[in-house]
Amino acid sequence: MANAPHGGVLKDLLVRDAPIAAQLRQEADTLPEIVLTERQLCDLELIINGGFSPLQGFMNQTDYNGCLDNMRLADGNLFPMPITLDVDEQQIEALKIQQGARIALRDPRDDNAIAIITVTDVYAVDKVREATAVFGSDDLAHPAITYLHKSVKNFYVGGDVQAVSKPAYYDYVALRYTPAELRQHFAKISWRKVVAFQTRNPMHRAHRELTVRAARQRQANVLIHPVVGMTKPGDVDHYTRVRVYQSLMPRYPNGMATLALLPLAMRMGGPREALWHAIIRKNFGVTHFIVGRDHAGPGKDSSGKDFYGPYDAQTLVTKYTEELGIEMVPFQQMTYIPSTDEYQPVDEVTPGTQTMDISGTELRRRLRTGAAIPDWFSYESVVKTLRESYPPKAKQGFTLFLTGLHNSGKDQIARALQVKLNEQGGRSVSLLLGETVRSELSSELGFSPDDRQKNIQRISFVAAELTRAGAAVIAAPIAPYEKSRATARDIITKTGGAGNFFLIHVATPLEYCEATDRKGNYAKARAGQIKGFTGVDDVYEEPTDADLVVDISRQSVAEITHSIILLLEAQSLI
């Protein structure tokens, strides 16, 4: 029998009566609307499907204060994580958000109305208080605290919601169970005791052994329940992770384990988050929940210390186990014993026994360099999946971003690089020359600071997409402003796959650029015929963070090209 929902009743708000659903959709089209953020969408989905039972909407101020102060809602139910809908003053005024107002909540991906909220109150946020109460700190090294201070708006809207529709998904649809559906699935396959395993990382042999041990100890089945909403910045993308989980499932004895995806926006809140995760799994019908070492920990604070103790999460969940009605299965870190070819919890290893481990950092290094990943650590199918998504350096894309004055030699260097990289082979090469981009992508833009910024953003977007696809990108705009170049670096390193970005300052002196200007553009600018010309009546802010500085007045194109090739070789990219 599945576990009872938290609070006694599963708050499944999905409307199954077609006429009522149609009426709500019709009403939503007439209401003021809030387009949700990614986190708000994740939260709303788990509100309307019952994953956050007993919540029936976003927290009002009374529930919010109770959650912060003693982890309890006004009705006395335990709930350790604030679930809030943040808005700013402009939205409050423009949408007339006040008690009794009805607001449509829309999916940012397709603009569909997901729910209608009936506002009970609007209240100001004390972000320092929230950070300290929930995360035990106000240190911006914590990703959720950074999000709170930099992304969350200054007011919260409380109120119950009515579901209009479910968020649409096109990936892994068969694995996306609501709490009611997963409970039905457990009943169908006659699972009475279920151990849930929460993860935001790929799984390897240690994780398989840990979950099998947990099932054996509790005479239960295993639910692999990974988070596929928002996780920690820098985590492996959920597409890759789900392929890993799918490849791992046949490694379990037939009928022991099943896989379901959880659209949760994690907060990396350590002990409170572990308690929250247990409540969510209870709502999904689970009877046991694995809490491991440093569960949902965010890593180090700004002083280099862990935000939470390694077993603080286990301690807090244990305190409330009886009230929750879900049994925690505590586990320490698993370690490999070469002599017996098995994994054991570190606290069960006999002193003096040789053990072996591979850290997350070391695994990433091996993936990056193509170094071997041993069978004792992971399975061949898992490693193959990870290598497909995270190829070694020699197969990764990169962007060479050349910046310098007009006629500084950027174009000659860029074209020579294109030839050398094509000669090298192994990846496609794309050339984004300043004049070409201006003609093909930015023909409507002028040369004002704002237009220059937009032009660089467009170049950066294209370069990032090409880099992510494994190409070698050579971009050669003037890019005179530090802000624009920082934007380019940020966009390409964050969205360009491995984020291999190199800023090359073509520092040819203005006098040389002007003296060798066969087109006479500098002369026209001096005569006032061209306005906003870099180096004449517009500034060029010299880079202070260039990866390489070259000068065509002192070096030949061949020498400069060779120095750039050596830079790439030093990074194992060629």
Curated annotation (Swiss-Prot):
Record comment: activity regulation: Allosterically inhibited by 3'-phosphoadenosine 5'-phosphosulfate (PAPS).
Residue numbers spanned by region Allosteric regulation domain: 396-574
List of residues binding 3'-phosphoadenylyl sulfate: 435-438, 452, 478-479, 519
Record EC number: 2.7.7.4
Positions that bind sulfate: 198, 200, 296
GO cellular component, one term: cytoplasm
TM stretches of this protein: none
SUPFAM superfamilies with a match to the protein in the record: Nucleotidylyl transferase, P-loop containing nucleoside triphosphate hydrolases, PUA domain-like
One GO MF term attached to the UniProt entry: adenylylsulfate kinase activity
GO biological process, one term: methionine biosynthetic process
Region of interest: Catalytic: 171-395
Annotated site, Induces change in substrate recognition on ATP binding, chain positions: 331
CDD domains: APSK, ATPS
Pfam family, one: PUA_2
Residues the record lists as binding ATP: 198-201, 292-295, 334
Cellular location(s): Cytoplasm
UniProt keyword annotations, A-Z: Allosteric enzyme, Amino-acid biosynthesis, ATP-binding, Cysteine biosynthesis, Cytoplasm, Methionine biosynthesis, Nucleotide-binding, Nucleotidyltransferase, Transferase
Active-site residues (renumbered): 199-201
UniProt comment concerning the protein's domains: The adenylyl-sulfate kinase (APS kinase) is non-functional. It is involved in allosteric regulation by PAPS. PAPS binding induces a large rotational rearrangement of domains lowering the substrate affinity of the enzyme.
Protein name: Sulfate adenylyltransferase
Organism annotation: Mycosarcoma maydis
Taxon lineage: Eukaryota, Fungi, Dikarya, Basidiomycota, Ustilaginomycotina
Gene this chain is encoded by: MET3
